[in-house]
Design a protein with these regions (language model features):
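Short, small-residue-biased leader/transition segments that mark boundaries at the very start
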Residues: 2-9
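Structural motif
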Residues: 6, 36, 107-109, 178, ...
Length: 543
């Protein structure tokens, strides 16, 4: 019978996975997100075979967003234990050894240590907006965009504040770098995560020498006993070995002592880099867009930009190619509020409608609208928007009396404006720097309704947008793939390895833009830029 043969295949697959685990052929990736720590175990075919998770929250202590050291280790152990339990339940075996191991985490922030390896001040995460002066001065000093969350901005702000601990610093790093160091003894960092600490020279695949020298000269009068290069982690690129799991490290990960030491470890990475790996967008001229509550686009560049743009953050792929990131705080929140208003309206008439059906029907309605949204204008600014220069926001909908005001255009304008700020950032790349974008991969809530967000996005960017059938397991899977790449790269570059070994059979749907769609979106964007004064007036006058 068919069912019998399916069960037979499943049993055979399970037996293969079981022997993979018992022989120590599986690879583990763990990523520390801002609300969840996630572990993904992959088999020799790069497929996730088990996951573990641990939920955690940052705390606001003395005005600083932080996680305690105890929480970091409790979270790591809890997440690993959860994975081990799933492996036991699914396959009836216990993990004793691994083929490879990798850690990733939210980027940036500040973890500083003294000569006794003691944490000098509580971990300052990327969420802290406390380094405004440092960021401003470093942009001038380096002629390079240094956002507030970059580690060097945190260090320089501590210097500007004359904080006592700065004199005692022996080493500072990111969260992924910290966990990796404690498990391997190695003070290293993957280049993607390192690019969120200090600017990178993409030719040498290391920190920018001139900027290191400029920084030391700039703070010379402080007479600190360190130079900046001495206290930064060593930069490694994808595929390089970054050390081995030590006996103490194995105990930190698995306090039961079941996991053996000696596993090779890949360079620890940041969540931007692992996201690029998990979406197969590390190739030049490609990028990915994550669109949900907020939206960000990451585009892999072929060369340095001609000048500094504060709207764009510069990071790198795990292989060390330059990436421009346009991040916008606001995306789908306002549209969700409107859809919930329509839901309330239907409920008032006693109509029961499923939320997914409501979203899908209204999103699809947008495709019937005019390419330029019929002259309508909206801003989805629930909060401030740095790309367009707003420190706070007011969601806003406005039209002329002769605009084509109908449901299709109404939904379409709210979908289009959700990408307006991000498009402003991308226009700098495509129009002022002549960057070519050939392919975009979309993921996140905006793409949940098939074909709609994708169509609007393709017209906004002017490039085909692909959405994969499975969203994958995100960054934890990405760092597991990087650990596997270290062991099995042969002579392949990272993008070749991903395309030929990992994603060769992945199912995806691509939508290309149309000439009419691109022109319509440009017309909408002219209206969007011209109307920013209306948004400003709403902020000034609606208190």
């Amino acid at each position: 019978s068919l069912v019998g043969s399916e069960m037979c295949i499943r049993d055979r697959t399970n037996e293969m996975i079981k022997s993979n685990i018992e022989q120590g052929l599986t690879t583990l990736g763990i990523e520390f997100g801002s609300t969840r720590i996630k572990a993904v175990l992959i088999n020799t075919d790069h497929e996730p075979i088990a996951v573990g998770a641990y939920d955690w929250e940052n705390s606001l202590i003395d005005g600083i967003w932080t996680y305690s050291e105890e929480e970091i280790w409790a979270g790591l152990q809890g997440c690993y234990k959860n994975l081990v339990e799933e492996v036991k339940a699914k396959y009836g075996v216990t993990i004793t050894k691994l083929a490879g191991l990798g850690f990733s985490a939210m980027m940036h922030g500040y973890l500083a240590f003294d000569e006794k390896d003691t944490l000098l001040v509580p971990f300052r995460t990327w969420r802290n907006n406390i380094t405004g002066q440092a960021s401003h001065e470093l942009i001038k000093l380096f002629n390079y965009n240094v956002p507030q969350r970059f580690s060097i901005a945190h260090l320089y702000q501590a210097i500007l504040n004359n904080e006592e601990h700065v004199n005692k610093i022996k080493f500072f790093t990111t969260l992924a770098g910290f966990v990796h160091w404690k498990l391997s003894g190695e003070k290293v960092l993957g280049i993607g995560d390192a690019s969120g600490m200090f600017p990178i020279d993409i030719n040498t695949k290391d920190y920018n020498e001139k900027m290191l020298a400029d920084f030391d000269a700039h703070i010379a009068d402080k007479n600190y006993p360190w130079s900046i290069r001495e206290i930064l982690p060593k930069v490694l690129v994808a595929g390089e070995n970054a050390g081995y799991l030590t006996a103490e490290g194995a105990k930190l990960l698995d306090p039961t002592g079941t996991l053996q030491a000696g596993t090779p470890m890949c360079p620890p990475e940041g969540d931007a880099g692992t996201g690029m790996v998990a979406t197969n967008t590390v190739t030049k001229r490609t990028g990915n867009v994550s669109a949900g509550t907020s939206v960000f686009a990451m585009i892999v560049l072929e060369r340095d930009l001609s000048k500094v743009y504060e709207e764009l953050d510069m990071v790198t792929t795990p292989a060390g190619d330059l990436v421009a990131m346009a991040h916008s705080n606001n995306c789908t929140t306002d549209l969700n509020s409107w859809i919930s208003l329509f839901h309330e309206c239907l409920t008032s008439f006693g109509v029961k409608v499923d939320a997914n059906e409501l979203f899908s029907t209204l999103y699809n309605k947008a495709l019937e609208g005019d390419a330029d949204c019929g002259g309508l204008l909206a801003y989805c600014y629930h909060s401030g928007e740095h790309i367009t220069g707003f420190t706070e926001g007011r969601p806003l909908f406005v039209r002329k009396s002769d605009s084509k005001f109908n449901l299709a255009n109404f939904i379409r304008v709210h979908l289009s404006t959700a990408l307006g700020a991000m498009k402003t950032g991308l226009d700098i790349l495509t129009k002022e720097e002549n960057v070519t974008i050939e392919q975009i991969l979309g993921h996140g809530g905006l793409f949940k309704t098939k074909g709609v967000g994708q169509t609007i996005m393709a017209n906004a960017i002017g490039a085909p947008v692909t959405v994969m059938e499975t969203a994958g397991e995100g960054g934890a899977w990405g760092i597991a793939l990087l650990a596997d790449y270290m062991n099995n790269k042969e002579n392949l570059s990272l993008d070749e390895y991903l395309s030929t070994k990992v994603f060769k059979n992945s199912v995806a749907e691509t939508i290309a833009p149309t000439k009419e769609g691109i022109e319509g979106f440009e017309t909408f964007m002219t209206r969007y830029r011209n109307g920013l004064a209306i948004e400003q007036s709403a902020i000034d006058n609606l208190k």
